[in-house]
Amino acid sequence: MPKMKTHRGAAKRVKRTASGKLKRSRAFTSHLFANKSTKQKRKLRKASLVSKSDMKRVKQLLAYKK
């Protein structure tokens, strides 16, 4: 069976915290800011954690990422 590889696209988008959780940036932050409220833009600046339901799948993609 071939070696399992780290999914490079996922590895660039996710960082592991000291406690082992996965930190990610939020979606909807690339353009069209004129249509978004100030409050929405402020909340989008903060990083978020990968949800509990997605953890197993994302951890498989990041098999060897520290």
UniProtKB/Swiss-Prot annotation:
An MF annotation (GO) of this entry: structural constituent of ribosome
UniProtKB keywords: Ribonucleoprotein, Ribosomal protein
Region annotation (Disordered) ranges: 1-49
Biased composition (Basic residues): 1-26
Signal peptide bounds: none
Keyword Plastid among record annotations: no
One Pfam short name: Ribosomal_L35p
Transmembrane segments: none
One cellular component (GO) term of this entry: cytosolic large ribosomal subunit
InterPro entries: Ribosomal_bL35, Ribosomal_bL35-like, Ribosomal_bL35_CS, Ribosomal_bL35_sf
Gene Ontology biological process terms in this record: translation
PANTHER family linked: 54S RIBOSOMAL PROTEIN BL35M, LARGE RIBOSOMAL SUBUNIT PROTEIN BL35M
Family note: Belongs to the bacterial ribosomal protein bL35 family.
Identification of the protein by name: Large ribosomal subunit protein bL35
Origin species: Staphylococcus carnosus (strain TM300)
